[in-house]
């Protein structure tokens, strides 16, 4: 996974891309991955680490630091997994998209609700 910053303000780290939504200090962003059995908990921890690194690396741009973890509970019945990102300093604008291995784009809001799923 490569860290990539564009002057448009979008960051792409492997499956994760971020651009612009307002969050406040102390907010927790939950990335909810629905019906994606190919994504295991170790992979989610990798995603969480890359989100952390991206926010840390962009701190001079976004004034953001974050600690991330992946929930180790995987609900087989619902087929979903959650990654949470805790924001400790102010973030001007941030939104998150997670891309999983099936060429599917999942757009999640700040409360962890799936907004849309795109199949290629």
Regions found by a protein language model. Give the residues of each.
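Catalytic phosphate/metal-binding cores of nucleic-acid and nucleotide-processing enzymes, i.e., regions
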Residues: 1-120
């Amino acid at each position: 996974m490569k860290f990539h910053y564009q002057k448009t303000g979008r960051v792409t780290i492997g499956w994760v891309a971020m651009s612009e939504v307002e969050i406040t200090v102390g907010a927790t962003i939950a990335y909810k991955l629905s019906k994606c059995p190919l994504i295991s908990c170790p992979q989610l921890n990798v995603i969480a680490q890359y989100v952390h690194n991206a926010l840390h690396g962009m701190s001079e741009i976004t004034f953001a630091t974050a600690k991330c973890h992946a929930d180790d509970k995987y609900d087989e019945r619902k087929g979903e997994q959650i990654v949470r990102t805790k924001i400790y300093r102010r973030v001007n604008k941030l939104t998150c998209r997670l891309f999983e291995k099936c060429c599917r784009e999942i757009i999640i809001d700040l409360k962890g609700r799936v907004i849309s799923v795109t199949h290629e």
